[in-house]
Amino acid sequence: RSWYYMEIFTDPSNENVVYVLNAPVLKSIDKGKTFQPISVPHGDNHHLWINPLNPKNMINSNDGGANITFNGGESWTRQDQQPTAQFYRVITDNKVPYHVYGGQQDNSAIGIASRTNGRGITWKDWYSVAGCESAYLAFDPNNPETVFGGCYQGIIDRWSRSTAASKSIKEYPELNLGNVPKDFKYRFNWNAPIISSPHDRSVIYHAGNVVFKTLDGGINWEVISPDLTRNDKAHQGPGGGPYTNEAAGGENYNTLMYLTESPHEKGVLWAGSDDGLVHLTRDGGINWSNVTPKELPEAIVNSIEVSPHDPAAAYITVMAYKFNNLKPMVYKTSDYGVSWVKRVSGIDDQTVVRVVREDKEVEGLLYAGTEAGLYISFNGGVFWQKIQLNLPIVPINDLTIQDNDLIAATAGRSFWILDDLGAF
């Protein structure tokens, strides 16, 4: 997986010592002539910090988090000694205390209580749910007995809390490992959207390059949209290049990245693709309109937020970092996508914005999760300012609001909760 592993490090005090990071960690003591694996707590290794004053002290980052050694890799800290999970999305239920759910890289999709009666939240408060590492999760927040969760290649499971049993309910039961996307029946993003309807929680939507709908827990699925992507066959070849096909689906392109249903109007669905398109249906999928902002480049539509105060208003966040463009892109519509205005003033010019959420109580009070922390706007995005507080400077992949708390899903520092948004 040459696109996934690409880091080589040398010991700053010994030019003969070289580390190559891959699924394992490889070490050479003869300038790369020979290599031997060194034991690390987790696979899929991506980065290594070597203390220039003491090269036996290193930090390894990997798909499971981060680990520290003080003896040159003979032993490492455990994976569960610090909150270094990497979450894709976040969703909550309405329990008291509410539980927070998300899919975390390499360590399964989980739920966790937001508060405990003990001495802090620990691993005893975590439990696995449906799906896998890349999961979107969906359920009835008032009764999260049944959880729907995703995995790569469009896999989707239905999990029962009372039995802890899962059942695969994929629309078209195929696993495309080793095939190329242009030959797939349906194309799914690594992080394929799954949502439940806020108007009828028995209705579940799942998005690939089209939108699927089920009324019976995934026994039967209906396609309710055409292909809502650019469907460019030239970009649907083998992932990772012709010699090292990535296979698992991390490079699938021309897929839907985000799907949401209006909390105000049943059947009003917004869909965003990873190739820069925004579509809207106002009749449950019978008719779809392309409402993409005219200036939008080919890029990832990572989130769509329908205003909780105005059914015609929505915010989208767009990421073009795969095109070496790190500029923030936030757009607002007040007329169901007929027109859009850009809303990025105050955000650092080279800071990708991943998600925007609007406060449920105060209209125009917005929160933006970016590649380098949190921003806030008090006027509908006309101007933004940083609000980092004690939150680590870390990518924020998703945000949600529950019981007047702001919950952040981060890439590298797990979940964080900002209590009592009423202070704003």
Placement of each model-derived feature along the sequence:
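Beta-propeller blade termini and top-face loops
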Residues: 1-424
